Amino acid sequence: MLSIENEKRIEKWIEDHKEEFIADLSKIIAVPSVATPGVSEGEFPFGIESANVLAAAKEIVEGYGFPVKNLDNYCLVANVGEGEEKIGLFGHLDVVPCGNDWNYPPYQLTVDGDLLIGRGILDDKGPLWASIFAVRCLKDLDLMPKREIEIFMGGQEECGMNDLLHYIEVSEKLPDVSFTPDGNYPICHGEKGGLRFYLAIPCSDEKIVDFKGGTVKNVVADKAVATLKNVCAECL
């Protein structure tokens, strides 16, 4: 348990680094980072956008004094502290497509009162960056646990998680316990899975030519469009 004195030290550290946090996070938000599904041959397994955000994050995190490894443009790994046991901190830098009709520019961090707005601010660039700063705080204040902390920054969580599979394949030692800042409270112990399916139904109405909406499966559709024929405007 932290002492009251250390709690105050942490609060002061957070306040002193708030502007730096927002400035660095804005650089990450500014990088479009929609990953491609599957695994492509060559230098960029998840496309150039995913590789770009990994490169941007690596440069910034190395500036904090953390050694960072780029695992073949699948993900980044930063290791901090020492110990026989390892704590894994898992987040991702790829995002889902933006869609249309944003009230704010999606790839520009907007500060509106106490709100931070931008694509990935909640899933998962913002929480991941807050966690990185939390590790910085522990390190700067000499409050690190007697364990190594390994920060995983993924490049393809939204459409396959091949970044995590590659990490598992090439890692010499996996974490003993892990935490992922990729969800709202309350804390959950696990996720049973997700259901994605195709539904086909017969349609006897010849007026409907086409019906579609959305861009990818894991995003709420911003609009739906139907193409009709032989329908008068008054009937709609």
Go through the PLM ranges and name each one.
Residues V68, L109-V111, L199:
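A structural signal for short hydrophobic beta-strand segments in well-ordered beta-sheet cores
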Residues L71-N73, G154, F211:
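Conserved beta-strand termini and adjacent loop/short-helix elements that scaffold enzyme active sites
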Residues G83-I87, D112-G113, P145-I149, K173-D176, ...:
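Short coil/turn connectors at secondary-structure junctions
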